[in-house]
UniProtKB/Swiss-Prot annotation:
The gene is rpsG. Pfam families: Ribosomal_S7. One of its GO terms (biological process) is translation. Belongs to the universal ribosomal protein uS7 family. This is Small ribosomal subunit protein uS7. PROSITE patterns: RIBOSOMAL_S7. Keywords: Ribonucleoprotein, Ribosomal protein, RNA-binding, rRNA-binding, tRNA-binding. One of the primary rRNA binding proteins, it binds directly to 16S rRNA where it nucleates assembly of the head domain of the 30S subunit. Is located at the subunit interface close to the decoding center, probably blocks exit of the E-site tRNA. Part of the 30S ribosomal subunit. Contacts proteins S9 and S11. The keyword Repeat does not apply.
Length: 156
């Protein structure tokens, strides 16, 4: 914990093409080694592929996919008298989005398509339909929280 003051949160500028702040944040998650132009090309390429295949607003599908991936509860380890319990806790809205974006990018990278844009497009479309590896991850996290509901009285 900082001794002085908590650093102020900086606002992310809207992305130039769609004017969406959440998409700009997502580009930052895709970006590696500070290469923002590459990240933009990947994300815009993926959204174009989604538009081609689904014939609908790609931003709408992107937001639908994020909603399908974002977890409502997660487990945190809490030590009580020599035993470690997995305590279910609600996820803050900002962390929900961050986790959803992280999982989306991670599982897109593990897919088999040739380019990252194609992988990302595939994972986005799968997530919007309620399937795919990122949605499975969310379900696993929810299952863990449900299994450890008995320890929810050890709140933080």
């Amino acid at each position: 914990m900082p001794r002085r003051r908590v650093a102020a949160k900086r606002d992310v500028l809207d992305d130039p093409k769609y004017g969406s702040q959440i998409l700009a944040k997502f580009m930052n998650h895709v970006m590696e080694s500070g290469k923002k132009a590459v990240a933009e090309r990947i994300v815009y390429g993926a959204l174009e592929k989604v538009k081609e295949r689904k014939n609908s607003d790609p931003l709408e599908i992107f937001e639908k996919a994020l909603d399908a991936i974002a977890p409502l509860v997660e487990v945190k380890s809490r030590r009580v008298g020599g035993a470690t319990y997995q305590v279910p806790v609600e996820v803050r809205p900002s962390r929900r989005n961050a986790l959803a974006m992280r999982w989306l990018v991670d599982f897109a990278r593990k897919r088999g398509e040739k380019s990252m844009a194609l992988r990302l497009a595939g994972e986005l479309m799968d997530a919007a339909e309620g399937k795919g590896a990122a949605v499975k991850k969310r379900e696993d996290v929810h299952r863990m929280a449900e299994a450890n509901k008995a320890f929810s009285h050890y709140r933080f």
